[in-house]
C-alpha cells in the first residue's frame, strides 16, 4: 500500500533534453523503470511516440523498447564480453552480423564520441569506471535510438570526469538527433545538459522549469 509516485504528468518533446532531480528515495529510479517497462504504474498511462505502453502486448512493447538507448547507474556492462561486443550487444541479438562487421560498427560509434579505438578488444575489468560509463553511452546510441535515458551518469565520478561525461552525453544526443531523459542529483550536470528540469519531491512533481529558472530559484 506504499505510494511511491503520484500525479506524475510530463511530456518529452522531440529534441528536448530533460533532467529529473530529487533526493535519494524520491522515486526517480522508479519513474525510469516505469518508462522502460520494468515496472507498471497502478494507474495512468505512459506513451512513447504516441503509443500507449501500459497495456500493450509484450511482443509489441519490446519492439518499441528495443529502440530506446539506456545507460544504468553502474554501467551494467557484461564482464565476459569485450568492449566492442558490449557496444553492439543490443543489435547483435536483432541482426545477423559477423565479427568483422561488429567491430567496424563499434569503431564507427566510438569515433563519433571521440573515444580511443584501443579499448575495443579489452574487457570491462581492464578499463576505469569513468571509461566504462563512456562505453555504456556508446552502447546506448548503437542503432540510432531517438530516445536516450541516462540513470545517474556522473554518480561516483570526480567533477572533472563528470564534466567529460556530460559533454559525451550532449554529443551522443546530437549524434542520434533524438531526445534525452537524465536521472541525476548533480546540479552542475543539470545545468550542462538539460533544457528542462523536473524536481520530484514528496512523491510528486514539485517543480518544472529550465536550469536557469532553477538557479534563480535557489539563488545561485
Where are these regions (language model features)?
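Conserved ABC ATPase signature
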Residues: 123-127, 131
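Helix-to-loop junction immediately C-terminal to a conserved catalytic motif
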Residues: 36
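H-loop/switch region of ABC-family ATPase nucleotide-binding domains
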Residues: 184-185
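Conserved catalytic motifs of ABC-family nucleotide-binding domains
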Residues: 144
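Conserved ABC ATPase "signature" region
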Residues: 100-118
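Catalytic Walker B motif of ABC-type/P-loop ATPase nucleotide-binding domains
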Residues: 148-151
Amino acid at each position: 500500500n506504499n505510494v511511491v509516485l503520484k500525479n506524475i504528468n510530463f511530456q518529452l518533446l522531440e529534441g528536448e533534453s530533460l533532467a529529473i532531480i530529487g533526493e535519494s528515495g524520491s522515486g526517480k529510479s522508479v519513474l525510469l523503470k516505469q518508462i522502460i517497462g520494468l515496472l507498471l504504474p497502478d494507474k495512468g498511462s505512459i506513451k512513447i511516440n504516441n503509443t500507449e505502453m501500459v497495456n500493450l502486448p509484450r511482443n509489441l512493447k519490446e519492439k518499441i523498447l528495443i529502440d530506446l538507448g539506456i545507460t544504468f547507474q553502474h554501467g551494467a556492462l557484461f564482464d565476459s564480453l569485450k568492449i566492442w561486443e558490449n557496444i553492439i550487444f543490443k543489435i547483435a541479438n536483432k541482426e545477423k552480423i559477423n565479427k568483422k562487421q561488429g567491430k567496424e560498427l563499434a569503431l564507427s560509434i566510438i569515433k563519433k564520441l571521440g573515444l580511443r579505438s584501443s579499448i575495443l578488444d579489452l574487457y570491462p575489468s581492464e578499463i576505469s569506471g569513468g571509461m566504462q560509463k563512456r562505453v555504456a553511452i556508446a552502447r546506448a546510441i548503437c542503432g540510432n535510438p531517438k530516445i536516450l535515458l541516462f540513470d545517474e551518469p556522473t554518480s561516483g565520478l570526480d567533477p572533472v570526469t563528470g564534466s567529460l561525461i556530460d559533454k559525451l552525453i550532449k554529443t551522443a544526443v546530437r549524434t542520434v538527433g533524438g531526445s534525452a531523459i537524465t536521472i541525476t542529483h548533480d546540479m552542475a550536470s543539470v545545468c550542462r545538459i538539460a533544457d528542462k528540469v523536473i524536481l520530484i519531491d514528496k512523491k510528486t512533481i514539485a517543480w518544472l522549469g529550465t536550469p536557469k529558472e532553477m538557479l534563480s530559484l535557489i539563488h545561485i
